[in-house]
């Protein structure tokens, strides 16, 4: 299975986890997913009143320069860890 196919499968598996990942894990997944699908952050940083959006933006921006395939590989690895930890519903 190609990295792209593994990535798509992992994106579906995340929706089926028995328990929700921690906020830190969710930010990691979000940043890797955005980097893998869009690339480097392409929007302005949200203002200080938008705490959740700012945290997501910061996490994504922290992946700046990471290639698509590498981001996909890291995403697949993280999802595998979460599946082992939480199981699938």
UniProtKB/Swiss-Prot annotation:
Q: Which GO terms describe its biological process?
A: fatty acid metabolic process
GO MF term (any one): fatty-acyl-CoA binding
Where does the chain bind an acyl-CoA? 15, 30-34, 52, 56, 75
* InterPro entries in UniProt: Acyl-CoA-binding_protein (IPR000582), Acyl-CoA-binding_sf (IPR035984), FERM/acyl-CoA-bd_prot_sf (IPR014352)
Domain of life where this protein originates: Eukaryota
Membrane-crossing residue ranges in chain numbering: none
The ACB domain covers: 3-88
Ordered alphabetically, the record's keywords are:
Lipid-binding, Transport
What role does this protein play?
A: Binds medium- and long-chain acyl-CoA esters with very high affinity and may function as an intracellular carrier of acyl-CoA esters.
Task: State the family it belongs to.
Answer: Belongs to the ACBP family.
Protein name, UniProt field: Putative acyl-CoA-binding protein
